[in-house]
Design a protein with these regions (language model features):
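A broad, low-specificity signal for short, low-complexity segments enriched in glycine/proline
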Residues: 12-19, 26-29, 61-62, 87, ...
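Radical SAM/AdoMet-radical enzyme domain recognition
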Residues: 81-101, 109-178
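A generic structural signal for short
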Residues: 42-43, 53, 75-76, 126-127, ...
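Canonical Radical SAM [4Fe-4S] cluster-binding loop centered on the CxxxCxxC motif
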Residues: 46-48, 52-82
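N-terminal [4Fe-4S]-dependent radical SAM core
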Residues: 2-54
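N-terminal start-of-chain detector that recognizes signal peptides
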Residues: 24-30, 71, 97-99, 121-124
Length: 178
């Protein structure tokens, strides 16, 4: 069965430190401890508290995709590291231990994202990325911190993807996935 093969491959190929951090941060911190704290904070503050926070560290992007809003904003909308840190710190006080990042292209800020992962190693971080800024150093840093995962987007096969995102982007993304 294809799903069983996928799960076995995932278990076989995932770095043990990354698997441990995922289990601890999503399984214990977010699902168990976080949920308990969220329920308490909902009563204290008399409002809904989400189980994750979605944030855009930057509006900047290294691509200029046809029809994308990011090119209209340029590189001027950025949360500082201190602002990102404050969001996570306040979120943890409410019981939130899962943070998703979009953009722009969040990996334009990969040094700050890794720094955030190091500082808040009890949290899980996930970035939606075009994949073109994934390099060996980032992969090594992700393996070291263990609490950052990526979703890499494509527009379809090479012709459709490169028509919208630019020539050669499809190949860069496939290389990043290796």
């Amino acid at each position: 069965h294809k799903w069983m093969r996928y799960v076995n491959r995932l278990l076989d190929e995932t770095d043990p430190h990354v698997a441990k951090m995922t289990a601890l941060n999503l399984g214990f911190q977010a699902a168990f401890y976080g949920t308990k704290t969220i329920r308490k904070m909902r009563e204290v503050h008399d409002c809904n508290i989400p189980w994750l926070i979605l944030m855009d560290p930057t509006s900047a992007c290294n691509l200029h995709c046809t029809g994308c809003w990011a090119a209209e904003y340029g590189n001027k909308l950025n949360l500082s590291f201190d602002e990102l840190d404050s969001i996570v710190t306040q979120g943890k006080e409410l019981g939130i231990y899962f943070y998703m990042m979009t953009g722009g292209e969040p990996l334009v800020r990969k040094a700050d994202i890794i720094k955030l992962c190091e500082k808040h190693n009890d949290c899980a971080f996930h970035c939606y990325t075009n994949g073109t800024l994934v390099d060996q150093k980032l992969c090594d840093d992700m393996k070291r911190v263990g609490n950052l995962s990526l979703s890499i987007s494509l527009e379809g096969f090479e012709d459709a993807n490169d028509f919208r995102r630019g020539e050669g982007v499809y190949d860069k993304v496939l290389h990043a996935m290796d």
